[in-house]
From Swiss-Prot:
Main location: cytoplasm
Residues where Mg(2+) binds: 244, 285, 312
Function: Catalyzes the reversible conversion of 2-phosphoglycerate (2-PG) into phosphoenolpyruvate (PEP). It is essential for the degradation of carbohydrates via glycolysis.
GO MF, one example: magnesium ion binding
Keywords, sorted A to Z: Cytoplasm, Glycolysis, Lyase, Magnesium, Metal-binding, Secreted
This protein's name: Enolase
Source organism of the structure: Thermosynechococcus vestitus (strain NIES-2133 / IAM M-273 / BP-1)
Family: Belongs to the enolase family.
InterPro entries associated with the record: Enolase, Enolase-like_C_sf, Enolase-like_N, Enolase_C, Enolase_CS, Enolase_N
Catalytic activity: (2R)-2-phosphoglycerate = phosphoenolpyruvate + H2O
Active site: 207 (proton donor), 337 (proton acceptor)
Cofactor comment text: Binds a second Mg(2+) ion via substrate during catalysis.
Amino acid sequence: MMDTAIATIRAREILDSRGRPTVEAEVELECGIVGLAQVPSGASTGSFEAHELRDGDPKRYGGKGVLSAVENIETRILSALVDLNALDQTVIDQCLLELDGSENKSNLGANAILAVSLATAKAAAEYLGQPLYRYLGGPLANVLPVPMMNVINGGAHAANNIDFQEFMIMPIGAPSFREGLRWGAEVFAALSKVLADKGLLTGVGDEGGFAPNLDSNQAALDILLQAIETAGYRPGTDVALALDVAANEFYEDGKYVFDNTSRTASELIRYYDQLVSTYPIISIEDGLQEEDWDNWALLTETLGSRIQLVGDDLFVTNPKRLQRGIDNGVANAILIKLNQIGSLTETLQTIDLATRKGYRAVISHRSGETEDTTIADLAVATRAGQIKTGSLCRSERVAKYNRLLRIEAELGDQAVYAPKVGLGPR
């Protein structure tokens, strides 16, 4: 039996950062090497995401348990993968997809499939004595992403009255990832003081950003500019702004309802145009509802040459939906969430399609995270140039930043910060 053959697979139900169950898997090779992976879970989920298998037993975790996914791993998946070569990631993932047999991974569960897919890759990398980013990305994996730091949370990520889900800062002017992280942390500290001085709450939301009650979405942008300047940086030059609007969450009967106002898609696009003209916003994610394709094309026509327009719920890391966007001139970037599509191979294929067609890829966490740092390695492996992994607090967020610091140090003089080579937001 070859050393890289899969000998056994173990799985368990663990907790994510919201205290909800999620799946952890260990893939052990014949040589004794073990790869371990944990999968995240989202709060604002797109309708077309791969299916996350939950038990539905109200007596356990309010029906959110994942023992059925764990059982699938330790029975059906183990039987199918035992003795296969862990170095053949494409074969492993194809076997998992065929075993599931559904369009959205609802039989085995995307959470079960992804946990095993990632754990296999980690075991293979460990066997070869390579860090995960090098195993996945080869010798050209040397670009450190610019972080999109979610410092004010709203929408489905916080119990406050702000409609837009994420207000982010991006240290685009920094000379390195390490310095960019420092700049972001200093702005975050300044933001805490600005909020406190205004008598606003400094409690944090799911992703570690502050979650104050504010009069409007624009009030959040004004406070961010103040925090950037208080920290000693220049808005737009050193530190830019980005939004995740998550428009699905306030789309009602064909209208977009926020700030106590109902808007048509055309009115909302004009509103975005005004925001971009007023504030140093360089990226807007999910600016319209996930099936509002015609108006997405209008939004792209209006703003696509000036800023990055990211599809998250719109594309759900799915190459078929991305191809539809490409064919119809919709958006110019895609958010990449491993658990939206449910396997490593499909994720890499989607990133490759985006890159070939001139779309930027933004590697992303979920609001329900774990200490798993795979997305940090994935960002470097794919030269994506951007990563979303929350704010500058909560250890499940900071773990990814710290992993990127270690990768940058490991790369030494070979490390390149994405904005320096034109791989940040357009």
